[in-house]
């Protein structure tokens, strides 16, 4: 079936009809003495449409089996010719059948060389399309140039297209190279900036902490400077002698703001020792509403209160001694820091207490009521136990006074009782807040005059044994003395 198709196809193509047998002739190429006839095949990688088939193509064979084929192109294509280059190889067993239409003879020829060419400007790998090019002898040379021309024409047309494409590719490659060149400078600054960026990153943390440090140095001092300004304002108000500002600073310090106002007020009070007693009395008289704030302050500073309880008792005794002495003598305000004045006030307080106890003991012994006698005995017994050896000579001298001096001594005792009756006007609750407001000042004074306070403590233990031996609060002792004085005053009235 396939053979019949091929035969029919061949007969149709060669215009050979019938089933007749035809003779096959061998060509001159089979003759070993032939040197003039040779058949070659040229294979092109493509066949351009712009090849001019009416003109002849040229084949040049150079050294090292190099072959150059030049094919003319049409004038309308714009490209004069297309050039192919390649190499040739010898055939060994390939043959070619040549059919002559005029005579009807069929000739078998041997192929000599196989030439494979490709377009010079294109560097594409050679992919030749098998193409049988018949090279007839000199007499049949017409078909060879025609076939060659056809092949070369196709090659020429391909050259035109490839030249256009190559020109375009040149432009494209040039643009790509330009882009690459453009990319390199773009990348080069990026590469240059990449090392610079880490440097900037290394610098940025260094600059950032410096900036924060500068801000910290700017902001941190600003807050205490503002507070210092306020404190200087408070100290200036205290220096001018404004009693309202003094009480306000004491209330502010007792309400939980003892940081700066108390410190500066303490310094100001140290600077002005003459008006210390008057201002202290005024703050004590105007400070009964401060008891609630004083309780709050005790709740806040309960830890420090247990450690400083004994010092508070001794300093309150000094304040009370100064108050009683100032009310008794109506003299100028005194400085609590002077050691001589403390000794005098302690001695006078001890003498007054001794005289008062003597009088109370004498009057209570003369009373007839059993209840009053029992209470007087218990009070006198406790007071006699608490008294020191320094007070006993005073009792002895007071008991041995001559009769001529009894009225004068009785008059002095009566004045002392009147002054002791005036003590409740000081309001016992106001003593502790006043001390609380000056608590920080006295702590600073204690730090500077620690040795001086030790001497005062020894003197207090020696001279006022009543308060030193008793470990309780001074307010209870003061109330006990006031009760005794009130009982004695009732006896005098009777």
UniProtKB/Swiss-Prot annotation:
CC terms in the record's Gene Ontology section: nucleoplasm; super elongation complex
Keywords, ordered alphabetically: Activator, Developmental protein, Nucleus, Phosphoprotein, Transcription, Transcription regulation
Compositionally biased intervals (Basic residues): 437-454
Gene Ontology MF: a single term: transcription elongation factor activity
Composition bias type Acidic residues, residue spans: 374-389
Superkingdom per UniProt: Eukaryota
Residue list for modification Phosphoserine: 188
Keyword hit for ATP-binding: no
InterPro entries the record matches: EAF_fam, Tscrpt_elong_fac_Eaf_N
Segments of skewed composition (Polar residues): 119-138, 159-178, 243-256, 280-306, 320-332
Cellular localization per UniProt: Nucleus
Comp. bias intervals (Low complexity): 139-156, 307-319, 344-373, 414-424, 455-464, 475-488
Keyword Transmembrane helix annotated: no
Region ranges (Disordered): 119-212, 243-494
GO BP term, example: transcription elongation by RNA polymerase II
Function: Promotes transcriptional elongation by Su(Tpl)/ELL. Essential for development.
Assigned protein family: Belongs to the EAF family.
Name the record gives this protein: Ell-associated factor Eaf
Organism listed in the record: Drosophila virilis
Lineage: Eukaryota, Metazoa, Ecdysozoa, Arthropoda, Hexapoda
Gene symbol of the encoding locus: Eaf
